UniProtKB/Swiss-Prot annotation:
Reaction it catalyzes: (2R)-2-phosphoglycerate = (2R)-3-phosphoglycerate
A GO MF label: phosphatase activity
Top-rank EC class of the record's enzyme: isomerase
Keyword Secreted recorded: no
BP terms from Gene Ontology: glycolytic process
Residues with site note (Transition state stabilizer): H150
Keywords associated with the record: Glycolysis, Isomerase
Designated name of the protein: Probable phosphoglycerate mutase GpmB
NCBIfam families: PRK03482.1
HAMAP family given in the database record: PGAM_GpmB
CDD domains: HP_PGM_like
Pathway: Carbohydrate degradation; glycolysis; pyruvate from D-glyceraldehyde 3-phosphate: step 3/5
Organism: Salmonella paratyphi A (strain AKU_12601)
Length: 215
């Protein structure tokens, strides 16, 4: 059985400002750095062998902090990037027009072909994050990888493993530096392949922060 841990990046400046990030970027806050250190402390006891991270700055920094604690090398994979949110990236949520807010709501309310102008659909996101996950099956026997990615990306990954469509209503909360675990297994009482063991664990954090889409 292959165990894969999933970690959302630490709190960023734009999270705190309720600003849409997508594939744009902002640095971790002091709280975000502390959250990443707490993940590192937890990960040190999990036997992590590989860290694979989105190549955006906020995930790279989170991965670097975790890697220092684990003593692991980091591989960067652009397929683990956040959903491309097109023309709304860098905008504060409270500043959106009614039309723009309608685009954003399509990403959370179950609109099958929803997307922000200039951005990705949830199905496109799902296809690439699943491709990144499938690469973990090529790691050496006994590996235990930890993937560092983003809130919508990881939420889509976990939800689709559970059998939901990529565009399903968004009802899974993954806070900054939460830890989830998925396993690739063969069981008599579970469907073969990927299963969800835990999702959104924040028991290792002193004060989990809310992101801009969860307030």
């Amino acid at each position: 059985m292959l165990q894969v841990y999933l970690v959302r990046h630490g709190e960023t400046q734009w999270n705190a400002e309720r600003r849409i990030q997508g594939q744009s970027d902002s640095p971790l806050t002091a709280k975000g750095e502390q959250q990443a250190m707490q993940v590192g402390e937890r990960a040190r006891s999990l036997g992590i062998t590989h860290i694979i991270s989105s190549d955006l700055g906020r995930t790279k920094r989170t991965a670097e902090i975790i890697a220092q604690a684990c003593g692991c090398d980091i591989t960067f994979d652009s397929r683990l990037r956040e959903l491309d949110m097109g023309v709304l990236e860098k905008r504060q949520i409270d500043s959106l027009t009614e039309e723009e807010e309608g685009w954003r709501r399509q990403l959370v309310n179950g609109t099958q072909d929803g997307r922000i102008l200039g951005g990705e659909s949830m199905q496109e996101l799902s296809d690439r994050v699943h491709a990144a996950l499938a690469s973990c099956l090529e790691l050496p026997q006994g590996s235990r990888p930890l993937l560092v990615s983003h809130g919508i990306a990881l939420g889509c990954l976990v939800s689709t493993i559970l059998g939901l469509p990529a565009w399903a209503e968004r009802r899974l909360r993954l806070r900054n530096c939460s830890i989830s675990r998925i396993d690739y297994q063969e069981s008599q009482w579970l469907a073969s392949g990927w299963v969800v063991e835990t999702a959104g664990d924040v028991s290792h954090l002193d004060a989990p922060a809310l992101d801009e889409l969860q307030r």
